[in-house]
Amino acid sequence: MKLKKEIKDIDLMLLLATIFLIIIGLVAVTSASFPTAKKYNLNSFHYLARQSGFLVIGIIALFMIIKMPRAVIYKNIEWIFPMSIILILLLWSPLGDKSKGQVRWLDLKIIRFQPSDILKLSSIIYLAKYLAKNIYSLRDRKTFLMAVGIMGISVGPIMIKDFSTAVVIGVALFAILLASGITKKQFLFLVILGIGLIYVILKDPENKFRIMRILGFVSDSTDYQSAALYQSRQSLYAFALGGYSGVGLFRSRQKYTNLPEAYTDFIFSVIAEEFGFIGTFIVILLFIIYIYRGYMIAFKATNYFDKFTAIGMTTYIGIQAFFNMGVCAKILPVTGITLPFISYGGTALVMALVSTAILLKISKEGTLWNTFYPVAVLGDIYILP
């Protein structure tokens, strides 16, 4: 009865899409991680057990966010955002753990996690709050440059260490700025600035491996042979082997030796091989439903803070899913971006559920929230006309 009360009035389609994606993820992780578990003499369900543990944490966080007053998120983002930046800066210290050519992990001995997953959410909420407070002065140069500064602080520290994640964050924040009604000149400024930053990063000698990835992807030539190009080709073989209906659950061959990141970066390829076109179509359809419902929640929002937050959260999930599936289908160069809700990874799963919880909360309490709270708690947030 209590559970029924909590989920009343929330966006049911978004919730169901999330549930089905998680179920598919648990099944896929079980299958894709089997060779790795066997290689290290672990229990066959080792990775499933760990992922399930993080899922429980994520579900608890989801219900806590749905129940807590919205003002808690609004007020505490003032220190959560700076703390997430500090965690990113720690990647430059000995605590930063290099993996697959990029420093994504922070190893604190007792816990190992990706601070970028926390930054994705905190930067979205922080920028949403700033723009909601200053929506009618955004065309003022100072206000706009402050918003650009928030983007720079969010993307800059992580861009060298984890370029692809920086792009995901940048696109999500850019989507919020677009929704805020920036001028054509401001839009062009952001585009030129983004292209310039990408050029500077790729020109850095330390990022030579990224250039090789791009050249190998574009030319598909043996002159640019690399582990990334090899993985892309093996991923395509997995799609080909899967055909229309797949080879069957646990029967993938590619996951044994040809796809080293089978249960993380290339889990979509394992799904394609074991469940074929039908399986990949279902996954893509679920993400389309999720993204559509997320943007509809943003469209129906009655204050700017809700609107911008929903747009940012939805874009982050959507662009990350697109990048991962695009890499697996070899329409994008290898990025190291995982598939939300499906790929193995504790921090990513928990943060994806937190973002979903925020979307569900906006859908559940939108009208009630905007009727009673803007003056008392969010007095500096403008209600949409």
What is each model feature region?
Residues 60, 68, 97, 126, ...:
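Transmembrane alpha-helix boundary/anchor motif
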Residues 53-58, 274-291:
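Hydrophobic alpha-helical transmembrane segments
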Residues 1-16, 20-21, 27-161, 325-340, ...:
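Membrane-helix boundary/helix-loop-helix interface segments in multi-pass membrane proteins
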Residues 167-178, 192-195, 288, 355-357:
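Hydrophobic transmembrane alpha-helices of multi-pass, membrane-embedded glycosylation machinery
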Residues 131, 167, 172-186, 250-279, ...:
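Interfacial segments of multi-pass membrane proteins
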Residues 296-336, 342:
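Loop-to-helix entry and N-terminal half of a specific, functionally important transmembrane alpha helix
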Residues 32, 145-177, 203-207, 272-279:
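Helix-loop-helix junctions and helix-breaking kinks within/between transmembrane helices
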Residues 99, 103-105, 188-281, 302-305, ...:
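Hydrophobic, glycine- and aromatic-enriched re-entrant/interface helices and adjoining loop segments
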